[in-house]
Amino acid sequence: MKVLLGTTNPSKVKRFADLLKGYDIEFITLKDIKIIEEPEEKGTSPEENAIIKAKFYGQYFDIVICNDVGLYFKELDLEDLRQPGLNIRTPMNMNRLSDEEMIDYYSKLIAKLGGKVTAYYLDGIAVYNHGVISSFMDNEAAQKTGVFDMIDKASSKRFE
C-alpha cells in the first residue's frame, strides 16, 4: 500500500518508517510527487494542524499521514510568548527561521533561562483515508516520558 507522508522532513520520514516497519507500506513524500503547495496552518494545537495538512494533501493522494509538533519548555508558562509551542520556526511572530537562525535564536533564549531547559514535544497525527480523517494528540503525560534537556550550545554531532 502506498501512503503519502505530508512532509519534506527526512527525520519525520524515518520516524514513520521505523514506527510502521513490518507493515506493507511504501511511503511517498511530497518531493516524490512534486507537491510544493503548503496549507496555511491556523490550528491551535499540533492535532489541528495535522488535520489541516492531511485534508489538504488528501487532494493529491488517497491515503495521507500528517504530523505536527509543538515544542515546550517547562521553565516557561504555557502563555509565555517565548514558549515555542506550534511556532518553533516562527517564534514571537518572527519571519520563518532557517536551521542556523533557529539554533542561534534558541541558544540565546536558553542562555537567558540559565543555560539549560527541560523540553518536551507534543505530537499531533492525522490520517486521511479516502476522505475520512482520524487523528490523535499526545497529552500532558508526554512531559513525563518524552522530556529532554536543551542547552545553550548546538551539538557538535548535528551534522553526523
Where are these regions (language model features)?
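Anionic-ligand binding patches
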Residues: 2-4, 11-160
